[in-house]
Amino acid sequence: LPAGGVLFDTLNFNTDGIPGVNTLIIEANPIDTITFQYDQAEQYHFNNIAHLRFLIQDDRENPMLDVTFDGLHILDGDVVSARPEILVNLDDENTTLLLDSPGDTIHFKVFLTDPSNVTRRIYFRDGALDIMQFTPANGPSNISKIMYRPVFAQDGNYTLTVQASDISRNQSGDNDYKVSFEVINKPTITEVLNYPNPFTTSTRFVFTLTGQQPPTYMKIQIMTVSGRVVREIDMSELGPVRVGRNISEFAWDGTDQFGDKLARGVYLYH
């Protein structure tokens, strides 16, 4: 470097695991540790050394955990499919420490308590068999996912517990995610009602389905007290249905099959 010259350089280094105040020491024309000679002779060397203090912010934010059954958030005690699709999402605000490695499965623990009250951990693999599928974060967001597709052959009440943390070991919350649910393998439709009842403008239908999958055929008939069918509502009108509790997207407005307003009074449905 000639007298009065300037040299610009860029140094990249990993700051993982060193949160807090750090010091970067930079030395120009350092001594050769083998020959104990400088590359260039200088009258003074003390001004060739710089100490730069810098702060690395510690990651203390908790990641957000989200669990859905067949695309929906369930409540304690809900009925679910005997073959549900359980999706676990872990969303971390830190986009520099991505959960982007297959080895990041160590940041998840999933437990299942069966109707016999036996709790066991669910691992990602059982020998050569994949039990849960892990999708790493791929940026720019830091969202990793677990897909779990169990088969619940035994009827009864289950409890799912999920623990998760980010790269910095921040837990997803003070408490584990825990939800209890019921499985009934036999296909049934129960707890059918309409709400509100009575109604003035429209009413929706509420019902609970059990089994492994939603029915392929379903119809609601509305009749007079004498048994005459005045309105039929098929699945295309009802909207999406699933195993578990349902409330129809369709709202009946008190009209017959031709759109004519029915007389006030009591009607039956099945």
PLM segments and residue spans:
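Extracellular/luminal regions of secreted and cell-surface proteins that mediate adhesion/ECM remodeling
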Residues: 1-186
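Short, acidic/polar linear motifs in exposed loop/turn regions
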Residues: 17, 92-94, 168, 199, ...
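Short, conserved beta-strand segments of beta-strand-rich sandwich/propeller modules, principally
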Residues: 21-25, 85, 157-161, 204, ...
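Aromatic/hydrophobic beta-strand junction motif of beta-rich domains
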Residues: 86-92, 203-211, 252
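Generic short beta-strand
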Residues: 108-110, 162, 219-221, 252, ...
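Short, surface-exposed loop/turn motifs with a glycine/proline- and acidic-biased composition
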Residues: 153-159, 235-270
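C-terminal tail/sorting-segment detector
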Residues: 177-185, 192, 260-270
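Glycine-centered coil/turn sites that cap beta-strands in beta-rich domains
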Residues: 180-195, 199-226, 232-236, 248
